[in-house]
Amino acid sequence: EYILTVAKSGMTEQQLKAKLESKLLELGAEGTSFSTIVASGHRGALPHGVASDKIIEQGDMITLDFGAYYQGYASDITRTFAIGEPNPKLKEIYNIVLAANQKAIEAAKAGISSKALDAVARDYITKQGYGEAFGHSLGHGIGLDVHEGPVLAKNTDSALQVNNCVTIEP
């Protein structure tokens, strides 16, 4: 919620990154768990787009991918939001990705294979006409490190187990 109050058109991605990381430290984070991603406008579709000097504009969708260490554990959070009213096509794509994310979260149960869980999100996005844009794995385990097993991907057979903590990232 904090970031929605400070993200404004006219600031750079780097400036927004600095505000986000400063807030994490203020709240008790021991440091970031990986390099913070802030990608706006046309850069928002980059799966690992590091923050740049690009100026955030009205109507831009902004993707934040960030995490912190707290009491020895890592977090990994991705959020996407708009500055003002986004282009209707971008809003449609956002809603498709959100629905795929929610479907995968609902399907994430002990015993499901990583491959089958990945297919829940990937198949939905493909049916909506955007399968070629899904170039990333579905997610990964998280805990003492930001990237742990299991890997949730279309070519991974391992199954989720009780108490796995995983990210769902489409």
Region annotations inferred by a language model:
Residues 1-170:
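Active-site neighborhoods and metal-handling regions in enzymes and metal-associated proteins
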